[in-house]
Amino acid sequence: FCEKMTTFAVGMSLSSIIKSSGVRNFTKLLSANVVAQVIGLVVYPILTRIYAPEDFGLLNLFLSIGNVLIVLSIADYYYALVLPKHEKDAVALTHLSLLLLLLTTVLVAVSVLFSEQISILFKSPKLSWYYWLMPFYVLLVGGWNILNYWYIRNKAFGRISGYQISQSMLLAGGKIGMGYAGALQGGMIYTAVVAPLLSLLTSVA
């Protein structure tokens, strides 16, 4: 009898753990991340048939520059959004992060005037063709980074999961669509900017 009661208690304990909000939220985020990764892996062989290696190189350079600018602009303040006990402190950090992001976006927009020189610096002449998209990329992806941690603070994990999946689907579909439409040189870069915009709009809707 005692053994049965112990087994029952353990079963109830495991059930309560599984049903706990923390585990559910973790599972939700993990599932979304796995789905997003699988989508990327599935479409990659298709993309390699559409785009040339230099197209992937140009995309990686564009994303690398943009991501470094985002890190420099927000200075990791958005990581701290989950820490304050008082809502007003979190709001103040959010405003500071957004202000820094906007200032950086303006500076990046000004740097578009020197896109030719920047492309020479990185030894990638074609970068100048698409560098005008950089301010939009910095603003959109940087804005999501801030919003992401705001969602974490408010336990809006469903919105984070939705963004991850929609982002992956839009990136995959957009790259394939742009490729078949003939936008081979910049198709993936255009998609890298448009997909975050649409995903961001979806997450706040």
Listing of model-derived features with the role each one plays in the protein:
Residues F1-I39, Y79-V82, A92-T94, L98, ...:
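N-terminal membrane topogenesis motif
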Residues T6, V106-S124:
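Short membrane-interface helical motifs at transmembrane helix boundaries
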Residues I50-P53, S124, N154, A181-G182:
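Helix-loop interface residues and adjacent transmembrane-helix termini in multi-pass membrane transporters
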Residues V71-D89, I152-R153:
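Helix-loop junctions and terminal segments of transmembrane helices
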